From Swiss-Prot:
This is Peptidase E. It is an enzyme of class 3 (hydrolase). It is found in: Cytoplasm. NCBIfam families: PRK05282.1. GO terms for biological process: proteolysis. The gene is pepE. It catalyses: Dipeptidase E catalyzes the hydrolysis of dipeptides Asp-|-Xaa. It does not act on peptides with N-terminal Glu, Asn or Gln, nor does it cleave isoaspartyl peptides. Its EC number is 3.4.13.21.
Amino acid sequence: MAINALMLSSSRVGNTPYLEHAIEFIKPLSQNTKKWLFIPYAGVSVSHDAYLSMVQQGLADLSLEITSIHQSEDPKQAIRDADGIFVGGGNTFQLLNMLYQHDVLALIREQVQAGKPYVGWSAGSNITGLSIRTTNDMPIVEPPSFNALNLLPFQLNPHYSNYQAPGHNGETRAQRLLEFTVVDPLTPVIAIQEGTALWRQGDSLRLVGNKEGYLFHGKQQEVPLAAGSDLSSYL
């Protein structure tokens, strides 16, 4: 497979402007790919037009032509015509549900497996794994299935942080991911912190950014993955 896919943990790091930190990660995928299609379906409290404008402004330094799938009367043809695909963050359940509604999930997978560059952040990264069972989001809608793009043969958990506020008695993120590994001990979960990403190029997978990631797999819990690690063995 000639997959060239970038899975960003988040659209921001700290108080930095929208997508600013991601430009250096996206640049290698965009040098020969100028016509991009944005998929804004994860946005719930923002209009598709406003979301598109945010992305266009955030990535203006890359001088790309970015249109949105919602502007096309034929979403499938819009995907075929694009040189690359951006999928934004928001609610992962809403995103996956709309991809199923428009019957484009399989087409996106096919196009990316054939070499079309893919960049997702947050929810747009969540859907690149086997399923969305390790998303952080509230299930505000019910997709026909939790099965996702399967561009990566494991589960993702973006925005990873195991911080627990003093006096707060809810589960930590690590505890929630432990629950997943109890019911599905054979499927790995790779958790990535804000400011980092996974970059798959064919049979190569690397953790990019300056923070470590974490592996949850069966009895292996919150195992650190060094920044810059080669994670190709998980493909």
